[in-house]
Amino acid sequence: MSKKLKLTDREWKEFVFGELFDISSTSSSIDKKRLTGLQGNNPYITRSDTNNGIDCFIDHQPGFVTDEANVITIGLDTQTVFYQSPPFYTGQNIQVIRNPNLNKYNALFVIRAIKMFVKKFSWGSYGATLTRLRKGKIFLPIDTNGEPDWTFMSDFMKRIEQETLRKAIDFFKPRNDKQMLTGGG
């Protein structure tokens, strides 16, 4: 990944969202008041715009199925968009976006495109319904076959991650002995 990846040296194409992704309502949709065991390991995803949409972690919920891992969630009323790596439960009005090519990195790239698309929706009369999502259009970089370039999107986001980590390490790394903390005695 030493080669500089640029968004500007790519061809881009408009895709109909519902033709590129399987979009469906969540499998669980549990009202928070009905949750049992609030000390578990399963993420409970809501329409919140913080913490990757995770409201809390819960135990297995008898009578409900988890949504599968490696998907993107969209909160209908709030237009929140997040990648979910483990299986999870959700609150109400969450849509689940699937594509077998998704991974942690290209999903982050796609999320940015989705956010550009859903920002036109609003709470109330013009929300992000399933029909509107399926008919919507997003632009993505393409490969030589005119298909989404999943590899480029992954590599691009990996590079962003590495650059961010490098900056964080450089920021926190002591530059000389005077900057190091010393203990009292």
Where are these regions (language model features)?
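An amphipathic, hydrophobic-aromatic interaction surface with interspersed Lys/Arg
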Residues: 135-142, 154
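A generic structural motif
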Residues: 100-101, 140-146
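Non-catalytic DNA-recognition/assembly elements of restriction-modification systems
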Residues: 1-27, 35-52, 144-185
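DNA target-recognition domains and sequence-specific DNA-contacting regions of bacterial/archaeal
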Residues: 13, 18-137
